[in-house]
Every structure is written in structure tokens, then in C-alpha cells.
Amino acid sequence: MLAQLIPKQGGAPITLTRAITVVGRTSKLCDLVIDHTNVSKQHCILVKTDGLLYLRDLGSTNGTRVNGQRVVRGALLPGDQLSLSGISYRVHLGPDNPAAGKVSPIQPT
């Protein structure tokens, strides 16, 4: 499964390549580093499993929000807005191979 966080403020999409990704501002403790003072050292964890993306807040000071609501844990759906202390991303989920599932048109003979 392809899971990406698309920065709402612009910038390149962040592809989540690990099954479990620790998100925060400290590079020694986190797989995905967000360099912002309001993001906790270890802010949240993102888990890819069975074609879904799950979130668990790690007791962050300023909280984790999904679609404006503060959450402790839950599933993220395509198009959800994930906010870590005001830093916002749109969640994109899709197949590993974007061509998978596409059917080529039959060529006339």
C-alpha cells in the first residue's frame, strides 16, 4: 500500500515507506522528522497494516488532530486532514503500483 502525507502548506509529498513510522521533531527518536517547535519529540506513530493507515498519539503536548478533531488513536482515510500542532497534511492512500488494477484497452485487430 502506498501511503503519503501531502503538505497543505505546499512541498513534496512524504511517502511512508515503513510499516511503522514514528513522527516527531527529534531525529534520533523518529523516522519522520518535522522540524517545528510545537511538534513533540515523539509526537505520534503511523502504522500501515492490511491496506489501512492507523494513527496513535504518543502523549504529545499540543495534540494530534484528524479533520479538526483531537484524537488519541484511529484509522486515517484517504483525503483526511492530519494536523500535528498546526502542521497539516492531506492523507493519500493507494496501491503500491499505481498501474495495478488498470485494464489496458483491447486493440482492434
PLM region spans:
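Regulatory inter-domain linker segments that are low-complexity and enriched
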Residues: 1-4, 87-109
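Forkhead-associated
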Residues: 3-6, 15-86
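Catalytic-core "active-site belt" of small-molecule-metabolizing enzymes
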Residues: 11
